């Protein structure tokens, strides 16, 4: 069995210049495929609000929903590190709430780490969760939970603030940081400055690793996708063809045949 990915393994990968792969998953079948294909980290993202639940943002997602989906993913993952994404208002309210809710991901759902959005503003949460023995992945730049405050999903270009946020989350105890929606030159500077790994999403090739939403990467999401997404397959098209073929065969009585029937 391949070595389980841990914070120590990720630190070694950064030190040796080996790129880190991360994808989202929200259920057992996809998590199993992602894990068996060699992805290093599985993010159970609050993005499930948009790609699974049909919401227009991640804001409505609840802790109970995140714990449920993380449980399914953790059950499937044998090698990959499972990271539970802390949803809106699960950590913003207080340090105590942050630690309690982070603990639910580990104790109830079986995750190995949690992710939360924000830089300096959540440093006390990162520190407290880390001191409770829970690995924390930070997330700076474009932070979807702050979409209203940012005025939409916009590229973040404030270099000094981004560099400062990155430094502060590292000092607070984060083992990694997601860099979302920032110019690649800034992401490169952050990656060279930090000793912890940077995982990019719309942040260029110089990050220590990359993450994508699986529904975007596999073409399951048929709506608008950001510029930074590459669709590696067109699963929605294949699924539609199969569903249409099924409907046609049932209507025409081509299915089921004797091969699919019992005597």
From Swiss-Prot:
Residues passing through the membrane, by range: none
Cofactor requirements of the protein: Mg(2+)
Keywords on record: Cytoplasm, Magnesium, Metal-binding, Pantothenate biosynthesis, Transferase
Domain of life where this protein originates: Bacteria
GO biological process: pantothenate biosynthetic process
Keyword check for Amino-acid biosynthesis: no
Active-site residues, record numbering mapped to chain: 180
Family the UniProt entry places it in: Belongs to the PanB family.
Assembly and oligomerization: Homodecamer; pentamer of dimers.
Protein name per Swiss-Prot or TrEMBL: 3-methyl-2-oxobutanoate hydroxymethyltransferase
Source organism phylogeny: Bacteria, Pseudomonadati, Thermodesulfobacteriota, Desulfobacteria, Desulfobacterales
């Amino acid at each position: 069995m391949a070595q389980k990915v841990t914070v120590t393994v990720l630190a070694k990968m950064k030190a040796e210049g080996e790129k880190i792969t991360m994808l989202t998953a929200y259920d057992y079948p996809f998590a199993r495929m992602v894990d068996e294909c060699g992805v290093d980290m599985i993010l159970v993202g609050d993005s499930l609000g948009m790609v699974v639940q049909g919401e227009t943002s991640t804001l409505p997602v609840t802790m109970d929903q995140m714990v449920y989906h993380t449980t399914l993913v953790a059950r499937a993952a044998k090698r990959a590190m499972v990271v539970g994404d802390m949803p809106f208002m699960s950590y913003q309210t207080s340090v105590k709430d942050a630690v309690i809710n982070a603990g639910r991901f580990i104790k109830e759902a079986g995750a190995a780490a949690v992710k939360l959005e924000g830089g300096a503003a959540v440093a006390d949460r990162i520190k407290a969760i880390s001191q409770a023995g829970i690995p924390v992945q930070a997330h700076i730049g474009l932070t979807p939970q702050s979409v209203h405050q940012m005025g939409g999903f916009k590229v973040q270009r404030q270099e000094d603030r981004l560099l400062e946020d990155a430094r502060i989350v590292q000092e607070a105890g984060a083992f990694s940081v997601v860099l979302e929606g920032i110019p690649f030159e800034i992401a490169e500077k952050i990656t060279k400055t930090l000793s912890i790994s940077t995982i990019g999403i719309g942040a260029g090739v110089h990050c220590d690793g990359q993450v994508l939403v699986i529904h975007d990467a596999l073409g399951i999401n048929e709506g608008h996708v950001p510029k930074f997404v590459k669709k590696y397959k067109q699963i929605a098209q294949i699924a539609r063809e199969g569903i249409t073929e099924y409907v046609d065969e049932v209507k025409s009585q081509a299915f089921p045949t004797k091969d699919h029937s019992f005597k």
